[in-house]
Amino acid sequence: MTNPLIDQGSLLNWPAIKTEHITPALDELLAKASDAVAKVTAPETPATWSDVVDPLEQALEKLSRAWSAVGHLSGVMDSEALREAYNANLPRMTQFYIELSQNEALFAKYKAIESSEGFAALSEGCQRIIKREIRDFRLSGAELAPEPKARLKALGQQDAAESHKFSENLLDATNAFTLDVDNVSELDGIPADVIDMYAAEAKAAGLEGKWRISLHMPSYLPAMQYANSASLREKLHRAYSTRASEFGPAERDNTPLIRSLLRNRREEALLLGFKNYAEVSLVPKMADSPAAVEAFLTELAQKARAKGLADWEEVKAFAKEKLNLDEVHPWDVAWVSESLRRAKYAYSDHEVKRYFTLPAVFNGMFRLVEKLFDVRINEDSAPVWHDDVKLWRISDASGNLIARFYTDLYARASKRGGAWMDSDTTYCVLPDGSVRTPVAFLVCNFSHPVGDKPALLTHDDVTTLFHEFGHGLHHMLSRVPQAQLSGINGVEWDAVEMPSQFMENWAWNYDTLKTLSSHVDTGEVLPKDLFDKMLAAKNFQSGMFCLRQLEFALFDLRIHDDDKSDHAEDFEKVLDNVRKEVAVVPAAEYSRFAQSFAHIFAGGYSAGYYSYKWAEVLSADAFSAFEEEGLFNPATGKRWVDEVLSRGSSRDAIENFRAFRGRDPSIEPLLRHSGIL
């Protein structure tokens, strides 16, 4: 019997992958990878690119792809059997990669390549890989004595297990709560199509004649924005804000995991000779130091504060004068804000949503990308992991295949929350001269279609789709011959969001929105007067939103950037202090935000959440080139592909930016686009 995790092909046979395949596949692929490591590190193996780096990359690629596929399925098709198989193999996979990163013999081979006469003859990309690998060996503790190296390895294994458990707890806590409503009058104010969705959810659970609200965003958010019942909103807000905390079952409480992760990260930093974990985190990033990040964030906070305070005062005044609310409670904020926005700009998110059917949005987004970047996008076919999933192909103007990508767009209980792009395979030129075609995943959590109507997207959903497709284009349009530098591989973490945030700008262009809007009942495109209202409201509460993001970023930085404390016992106090300094909207006393902050405790953004704002500066300034030269100027689009999207990490991100823009980045376009200037 063949094993689809071993017999991989250009596209994986997703429905053929069973949990019983996972361990045997990893047994075989780990053994082959270990053999390859032993061969390239043997004393008689010459320290050359072709004898060490190429064969090792080829051996590791199959293992990495198989394990990534298991991780992908864990994120989109969670089940008890899959979870058991993933968790059973996580320790040995973590051990393999940690031991590889600390392998003294392999480290010595890379150093020998760098110091050899042949090094100068290598391409610039190959030289860059060697230098980066040497840096990463040092960051992994390859130069440490045996005892601290073993300790660092143990900490790394524990971190991997605890990060995954954090994510599992959050998903389980999100799924554990539902609010079943007996009387439709309790849903007063909520749009009819959302109420229909609640009825469908209840019916699917065997509760005919009732309505079920969950904590998944397509269900939770409309209730918080539109429900006139304060008691309904309070119940939902309390449940959402206390997920995976001490307010629920102990086995789903993420507090002990946060404490352990913070302790371990500080210990890892000290073992490596750094003062704190933030210093370690920033070594491969654009930002020079934690102090530089702190200065960047506090400067932005100062510039946004006046607008944020004005936004909050407007909310409170409207609540008192129009809604008879003397106090705006945490569960009132979204409802009052949406009511204020409707009153101020005379439109609702629900009204806009009727114009954005998923098929029309996809078609319009693809046509835009085709025009900007001279490619063609068409639906493809191949076995997929769920009926909701589709496969697409990107070709050049002559029809030659460039890349493929899967889309998995609807929320379901087996899928973790949020939206993301991930990669299956990365573009590269193989040793035999053939090309590996990149394959990407585009995953979202949109509302399902109801009845015979297509799925409807909010404008925020449209923006999210553009964002994730921006990541996908960065991965798929890469033309770097070395896989280690191709796509998003090796791109500085604080620059990797630049192409995604860059694409969001077209979701605010009327000519673009005309091509991707089609009213669900009439087929009419988005009217110009409605768009004008949306545009006028674009920076509605932008000060509040900016300060909220800066609150998250400063909290993340400060729990990791302290020479004297790991903040394991007082991380909530750190958050409270950041809120006192930055926030304008009071948090609920019961809020346990950190326990659901998966970005930094399970998503790779530890001491790196600032990256979103850092990359916004780059993306806003990059988009201003299109504002200056024409939004649909193919020459500007080609320059963006040539100097940024196709480059991967073959150059530093700042060099890519300078090559595209002709100068260093400016913060002014971001402040202007945000309405803060």
Where are these regions (language model features)?
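Short, glycine-/Ser/Thr-/acidic-enriched flexible segments
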Residues: 218-220, 268, 397-399, 409-413, ...
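Short His/Asp/Glu-rich catalytic/ion-coordination signatures at enzyme active sites or charged loops
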Residues: 6-21, 70-89, 112-154, 214-256, ...
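C-terminal, non-catalytic "cap/extension" segments appended to globular domains
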Residues: 1-21, 28, 189, 197, ...
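Short, hydrophobic/amphipathic alpha-helical patches that form generic packing surfaces
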Residues: 62-72, 131, 135, 238, ...
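A non-catalytic, amphipathic alpha-helix used as a structural packing/dimerization or gating element
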Residues: 24-28, 32, 154, 158, ...
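Short pre-active-site segment immediately N-terminal to the catalytic Zn-binding motif
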Residues: 447-466
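Active-site-proximal, well-structured secondary-structure segments within enzyme catalytic domains
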Residues: 125, 129, 168, 172-214, ...
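N-terminal helix-rich structural modules
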Residues: 1-191, 626
